[in-house]
Amino acid sequence: SQIAEGFAREAGWQAFSAGTKPEVEVNPFAVTVMAEIGIDISHHIPQSVNEFLNEDFELVATVCDNAQKSCPVFTGNCEHIIHHGFPDPANATGSDYEITEVYRQVRDAIQVWVTELRKFKFL
């Protein structure tokens, strides 16, 4: 979700990444592959979805394969909830090169998806 937040912010949206079980820091592979295309997410801080329950949102998007199961309902205030499952690159195994390639593939897929979302009137 940090990658999706990076693309959303790059598109000029106010965006926040939050998870049901946030990590302590942004995955360094995600930071690397986003830096490759000129987007700095090194300053992002993983947050819990619970931090946003009292906020109003136009759109809440879940992006991980397991998010639909572990976070089926966002109980905060939002107009639209959408889900698009992407493989979790944190599950990649192999050499650093192989793991980086998985992150690139997921990054590129998320970039296409965020670009498509821009076509909807609620964004």
What are these regions (language model features)?
Residues 48-52, 70-73:
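Short amphipathic alpha-helices and their capping/turn segments at secondary-structure boundaries
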Residues 70-123:
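Phosphate-binding/catalytic loops
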Residues 62-63, 83:
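Redox-cofactor binding/interface segments in oxidoreductases and associated redox assembly factors
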Residues 65-68:
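Short glycine-rich anion-binding loops that position phosphate/pyrophosphate groups of nucleotides
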Residues 54-56:
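Alpha-helix C-terminal capping/helix-to-coil transition sites in glycosyltransferase folds
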Residues 1-50:
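Conserved active-site segments centered on acidic
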